[in-house]
Amino acid sequence: FLLMQVNPFTLSLPVLGTREAIFSFVQALIRREDAPYVVMPNPFYQIYEGATLLAGAQPYFINCTEDNNYLGDFDAVPAEVWEKTALLFVCTPGNPTGAVLSKEQFKKLIALSDQYDFVIASDECYSELWFDQAPTGLLEVCAELGRDDYKNCIVFHSLSKRSNLPGMRSGFVAGDANLLKPYLQYRTYHGAAMPVQHQLASIAAWDDEQHVEDNRQQYRAKFELFQTELGHLLPLKKPDAGFYYWLKVDHDENFAKILMEKAHIKVLPGRYLSRETAQGNPGENHVRLALVADLAQCEQVIQRLKAIL
């Protein structure tokens, strides 16, 4: 995270993966009686919405489309929404789009947070899967601005993508100590304690950077293979970071069914990751293709796709 000094006792907490952490953080933060907005990208990681609804808040969706480089148009959010907002979720690199927020965009969001007094929760689980340059993180921007207290800023990260350990359920939350202190108190009742063996395995994974670089190299090779072999058959656009293709198709559900029926390849229809808004459903006519299989399996997938395209 390019931070020189972070007090591990006040500015971070270990969690059982970011799914659990995101859900419980929302429950700890939201005042149900206020029925505030939680602003989030659309499409999105489904825990954002589920946690919001179960906390008694209202989701407000910002459509992430090709027109706004899949980053959303924060200027289009009405002032009356910001005034009632308790929490803003961002995901950078994005799931499913792979889009990365710039330093300038983070600064704009921090200014909005100061103006309207809401919390920014940055889901950065894909932040270590990049091609040429590491993406900027929220806390890094805070430090550059001299905000060493990280006021109203929280980051979520885990071993799931970085180390290919999604089943171990291990991650951390870092940021504003004034938010983490009551969140820790909530967690003492929540009962989410990490077993010692998971702690030891987590330490080993966090301490080793070579396997992370090896992981990045493998993803680079897989994306290069897909671009070379299928770029003339499919509108493949390499993401800014992450391991997903966000592929434009004529009809996402039909495309997914055809791939499953004819080639036994599973992709996720984009409409399942997004919600209908007044501007439409930004996930429609897209599918999410995850390059998480090894290179040999990816080569097999490519041959199967060539046979039916």
PLM feature spans:
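PLP-dependent class I/II
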Residues: 2-309
